[in-house]
């Protein structure tokens, strides 16, 4: 710009500038609201039946009282690509990653156990973090791990809307054996209230 603008972003509007992947401005002043520190626990649950673990994870994501930063589900064989964590999984298991407030982790583990899920990984998110930590395997990191294992994989990101389970099943029917699901539960436009 010939005449630089002063743009003030507050609250949710600031999120628009977080992942812009390039220099698009110079910050001249930053104000941050502080909140109490939350200690997080990294939990990984497994089950050999996709519907069992998916339904449990979806239900868990909709429970508003949990303070969590991450809820991710991986269809088998995606977890087999995760060097550093693969030793915690059995070969045919689907997995769910949860990053949850440490003081609520026992409740999450009890719910998972009641649903027949296996707890495969239970570690605090240390300060500073020490690998392996589950955030290194989620979002676009998942694709990088998969491509390291199999460079022929194609990646497609999709937003399914509110009837996402039916749309996933439709993909499996139309493309049997060709679609593997990696699901990130987000606050976004859903009814879920994530921290």
Question: At which residue positions do the language-model features occur?
Answer:
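FAD-binding subdomain of flavoenzyme oxidoreductases
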Residues: 1-61
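C-terminal substrate-recognition/cap domain of FAD-linked oxidoreductases
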Residues: 58-195
């Amino acid at each position: 710009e010939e005449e630089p603008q002063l743009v003030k972003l507050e609250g949710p509007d600031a999120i628009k500038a977080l992942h812009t992947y390039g220099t698009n401005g110079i910050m001249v002043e930053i104000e941050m609201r502080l909140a109490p520190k939350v200690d997080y626990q990294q939990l990984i649950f497994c089950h050999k039946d996709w519907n069992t673990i998916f339904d449990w994870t979806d239900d868990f994501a909709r429970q508003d009282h949990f303070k969590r930063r991450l809820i991710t589900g991986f269809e088998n064989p995606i977890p087999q690509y995760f060097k550093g964590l693969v030793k915690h999984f059995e070969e045919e298991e689907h997995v769910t990653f949860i990053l949850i407030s440490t003081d609520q982790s026992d409740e999450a583990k009890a719910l998972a156990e009641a649903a027949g899920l296996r707890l495969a990984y239970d570690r605090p998110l240390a300060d500073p973090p020490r690998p392996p930590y589950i955030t290194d395997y989620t979002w676009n990191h998942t694709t990088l791990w998969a491509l390291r294992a199999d460079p022929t994989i194609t990646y497609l990101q999709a937003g399914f809307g509110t009837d996402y389970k039916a749309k996933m099943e439709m993909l499996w029917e139309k493309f049997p054996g060709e679609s593997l699901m990696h699901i990130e539960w987000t606050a976004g436009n859903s009814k879920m209230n994530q921290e």
